[in-house]
Amino acid sequence: MLEKFHKNKKDSYLNKEEGSLTSDGSDSPKEILETSERIVKKALQLTEETDENVHPEKMQLQKSNGVAFSLSRDSLETNDSFVASGPNQSNTGLGLDTLEEQEEKEIFFAKLEQEASSPIDYSRLNKELNLSDSIVLAPFVRNESEKEVESTAEEKCESYSEDFEEDTDANPAFKTEESQEPNSGMLAKVVLLDSQDSTTEFQKAAETSGVALSEHDLPQEVGGTEMNEAGTLCGQTTSDTEALHHAYHHHIDQSLGDTDEQKIHSSSMAISQCLVQVTSQNHNLYSKNTSTTESDLPTVEEFMRPIKGDCYNARGFDLEPESPVKVIGSTVNEHVNHLPYKEHKNESVWETNLLEKFNREDSIFLQTAANEDSFLRMPGKEIQTSEVQPDVLSKEIIQDCLLSQGSKTKQVLQSCCLKNEKSESTTTKQMLYKNIRSTTPLHKKKSSYGPHGVVRSSGYGKSTSYSKQSIPATERKIPKETLKKSIMKCRSPADKARSKEALFTTRTIRSAANQQASKEDISRAMPDQSVVQNLGHQVVDSFRQHHSDLPVSPVKSCERELRLLRRAQVAEEDLSRARDVIQQLTSTVSEKEKEMETKIVELKTRYEKELSQLGQENYVLQSKLRSVEELSKEKRWIHQTGTVSVPEEKLAQIQKEMEDQEVIIQGYQQENERLYKQMKDLQIQNKKNEEQMYKENQCLMSELIALREKVERINIQSQIVRESEPARNQSFTELISELRAARKEETKLREEIRRLKQDKQALELDLGQAKKERDLAKVQITSTSSEKSYEFKIMEETYKQEILHLKRRLHWYAENQDLLDKDAARLKEAREEIEKLKQEVKKLRAEAGDHQCVQQKKRLRDRAADAKRIQDLERQIKEMEGILKRRYPNSLPALIYAAAAAEKTNDLSAKTNTTDFLERRIKKLETELEGKDDEAKTSLRAMEQQFQKIKMQYEQRLAELEQLLAYKWKSESPKLNGDKANCIELELQLQNLKKTHQITVENLQTEIENLKSQNSQLKLRSKKDNKDLQLADWQMKQGNTKEKLLKLNQELITKNREIQDLTKTVEKLQKERMAMLSDNNLRNKTDNKENRQESLKNNTVATEKRNSCNSEPLIGIFNNDKIYQPHNFSDSNVLEVLQENARLKEEVEKLSLEMNQQRVKSQATLAYSENNIRRIQEDTAEYVAALKASHQREVEKILSQYTKDDSASKVAELNGRISTQEILIKHLQEQISEHQRHQEALLVSQMREEF
């Protein structure tokens, strides 16, 4: 039977794919529905028979068990909650509590039911537990109507079987609630816990998560790469699983031979497609949480992962793997056995949706590709039984498919891509899945059914782990240590941490009465089987049990698999490209953020530096002011002590009086300020008190009015009601007491008002006294200021005279300095001329040496020749003279000739020598005169300087003598004039001291202002220099960039011209091609006319042939193919033209690419140049800042030196400057004298050379 099942499965799958590829819509929707319903009925009958044969014990247990409790956490949705069902509900599930806790719960619930007068609301009980317990579980509140619906559902599903290793929770109430709520993001707040750890970790994780999960929205597809670390691996090693998969695959290959399923092709494809859509909803959410090892090979976790059978919308099971696994698919039996029992009548809607699905071939291909491997490898032992009617089940399958049909195509595409990415690991999985069917026995799980399994555990006992489940006899031989080692090897460190921090996703509590049924259910949770494969296998197997008609070749399936693998590779490449783009974008964004951060930091540092500099400048100026004030005081006392020797006792008395006056003035000032503040405060207080009194008066008036009204009312009531006399007396006494209290308050307030008025009058008197004192102080200040102003004027006139005298001296020194500068410039020019002359002399000597060698050689040759000629001529002359002497010994002409010749030669030589000598002498004398004039000027200046020195010395000596005389006269005058003269002199000295002090203060203020102006000028100069530097740099950079841009523009212009030329050539070639084609058409028309005249009988046939002949050459020409035709001339140039056209197009494309590349390069160069400009600007800014800092330091040093050196008065400062300038003048005069000596030596040497 299993072989037939697998054959039907294979054939239906292949027929479904062929139909999706080649179907032309021949089958109608009604036929599809009829065939699908027949298939589902037969599949359900078969599954019922097999399940009754295989699981009779479980059927009995489920029928006999009328009361069951479950608390299930199968969902990984964020909006799930724990569901607590009462004792009359059919929620069963596998629990993790110990037997002792279950017994305690039974006792507790028995007590509750005995004590309770009405039926217990377990949802409210869960809420109360949520408030007190450390585990936060949101209850799933149910109404009485829902409980009734669940009880009706319980009657239907008493013998309801499980799909894998979990009991069903067939609650129809879930369907309505789950259809209302959309699936939210799963695994967002999932908390997992290793079952081998204590429940304290469960509590901690629950407290951290803060989200209670329920079975409201369940994951639809589970097939991850992690194994259930807390459960057992059924005692299988990798070798065992490989052997099982090999055997299973071999069995499937044998069973693929004779199949006959042509009739159910379209219906099976439709239903499987719907189921694939249903089971691929949450694929994207679960695929994020897959955990795989680093190697490409499949691990034990991948082979031994537990199967999680979740159905769509809370038709799940109680057991679920603890690790977050990737959602891929669910089984057919989940959709068949766990659908809610609900009659669906809208079959026409399903038919229309089915027709729309057949038209979407692309989505069908992708959906079938996602589960292709699972359709080909399906274990036959996953078939479950149910007693549900086949018609109802088929309708519910269709309804589920329609519900999940809406917007799931994108999720299916993503699931396909993610599955095909792991094509390497699926090859090994195929070998493993072959062996499952042949060797693995069925195992059942323990289930604890009890009437009170709803309530959560207290958390003190250890939870039951999967290692306590029963293991088959063939697998019990393997020790537990090897299993633990294999588990620890498979687990990565991150997975270990996750498993310890996490919760179990399933937590169901059952009594220990029906443990044997759970043992039988364990065998359905095969850890080697992924849910992807179970879905496909069970869908196709259920369709192929009774319809095996059409055999399919395995070659087509291989080709389809290759196609799908290619598509998967393309999708992987697209994903990798998208990831690369995303990484590039993130890197660029991060770089820009870093640049912005660095700029912000630089700006902050600049502003902080500027602030610190300004603070330093302020501090320096304040310190200068203080130092100047201190110096002025010191100078005043020094001048006082130096000029006039006054007795120290009188000076001390005068100082004390001055200090006392200043203290008195400061005290008056402080008292005035204090009294003014007090006056303001008192005015404010008076205003506040007046406002308060006014308000209180108004309140009292309103109270009085109210009291009067009350009194009137009481009087009226007393007149009307005379019987209630004691009550009236009481009210009257109360009113009297209130009036007395009000009167007391009024008296108190009046006393306060009187007191405040008295205070006000006292303050006004104080103010009057303060004003009088202020007026007296003003009068005193004006009198003292008028006396001092006269003294200030006298001191100003004296100092103005001194300033004029000093300015004249400075002008004279400036003229001296100009003369010295001129002399220095002349010396520099003379030195430069001397150096030039020396260089020329060296050159001339070198040239003369060369010429002398050549000339000497020539002279030697000429001398030899001349010597011979001279000798000949002398000999001839002697002979001639002898002849003449012999003939005319005393002739006059001979004597005259000889005398004239001798005079001429002597006169010429004498004239030339004398003129040269005289000219040289004149030049020397002129230079000597100029030098002497300069010396006379310098000597005059020196004499003037000496005269000024002597004058200054005499003036100083006269001043000293005058001071001595004054001192002597003053010392003698007290004896003569007495005390009055001393007092007058002291007063005069005080006035003089005051005048000098004021003058010094004004001078210091003027100096400070000058220094400030100088500082501002220096700052402006530095700023201007910086701006000039920046402008120069910027202009240079702009010039470079402009040159580059011009070059690039020229290149662009040349390229554009080349492109235009190429386009022109292309247009010419196209025109030539069109002309050629038009000629061909004309020739064809002439040929057609001749053929028509010749063959009139076969007119229709000929026209058709001619039309075909006319169209075919044109098509060939446009397709770059030349077809031979006998009636057309053989045009050999057309192909060449087309080839040239293609070549030119390629060149144009290349040129465009080159242009783009050059543009990119130009942009890169521009960016690089901009970066360089920025860097240079930053460097210059730093350099300028450093220069500014150094300049400020130097200025500060100069100012400090100035303040240190200038401890004396302004006259001493100017004297110091004059002395320094005199020293400089002496030094320069010495240098000038040395230079004059050098010049004279040079002149002597030149004269010697000339002579």
Curated annotation (Swiss-Prot):
The keyword Zinc-finger does not apply. Residues 160-169 have a biased composition (Acidic residues). Expressed in retina and brain (at protein level). Residues 1-19, 144-159, 1082-1095 have a biased composition (Basic and acidic residues). It is found in: Cytoplasm, Cytoskeleton, Microtubule organizing center, Centrosome, Centriole; Nucleus. It comes from the Eukaryota. Keywords: Cilium biogenesis/degradation, Coiled coil, Cytoplasm, Cytoskeleton, Microtubule, Nucleus. Required to promote assembly of the transition zone in primary cilia. Acts by specifically recognizing and binding the axonemal microtubule. Plays a role in cell proliferation and differentiation in the neuroretina. Has an ATPase activity in vitro. This is Centrosomal protein of 162 kDa. The gene is CEP162.
